[in-house]
Amino acid sequence: GARVISVARQGYGNALTGGINAARGRYIIMGDCDYSYDFSGLQPFVDALREGYDFVVGNRFSGTMEKHAMPFLHRYLGIPVLSYLGRKRFHTFIYDFHCGLRGFTATSIRSLNLQCTGMEFATEMIAGFANGNHKIKELPINFRCDKRKGASHLRTFSDGVRHLYFIVCKKTLN
């Protein structure tokens, strides 16, 4: 079952770090709870972790994507460009740097000592795994429209700039 925890400081990175630190299992799988990810399809993630992968990340572009599940500029400009730059900078094959459906071993994620508190945490995580000689796998996933009521917390321009700054300027922690 799920356990709800409270995190004192706001921010995507802070929330995920709080969840990672509170997790009790050998494997941790994270995903946005906006109905855009199909959590009934997690078996390939679990299988990959059991096969010895340290980090498993979804690829929304290689699975089925519902119409309007992702804004046009994110789908055709922002995510592809930032992912391309991230692949070159961190020498990894991951094509969807910003997919929120991810799995990892508790030991490996905690060894990365991730520091980012905002959305750029997603890029920092990939950089940490890529630069730390970890075994990585990317899996196609299905991506659906956000079914929540209310506004998204994503701030396209400022979040994109922070991801870009991390890719270009930050030294990796490993």
Model-found features: residue ranges?
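Acidic donor-binding segment of Leloir-type glycosyltransferases
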Residues: 1-5
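Catalytic donor-sugar/metal-binding loop of nucleotide-sugar-dependent glycosyltransferases
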Residues: 92-93, 114-117, 126-144
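Acidic metal-phosphate-binding loop of nucleotide-sugar-dependent transferases
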Residues: 35-37
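DNA-recognition element of transcription regulators
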Residues: 123
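Acceptor/aglycone-binding surface of glycosyltransferases and processive sugar-polymer synthases
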Residues: 7-22, 27, 39-119, 145-154, ...
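C-terminal, non-catalytic tails of nucleotide-sugar-dependent glycosyltransferases
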Residues: 163-174
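Phosphate/oxyanion-binding loops and surfaces in catalytic or ligand/nucleic-acid-binding neighborhoods
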Residues: 88, 132, 170
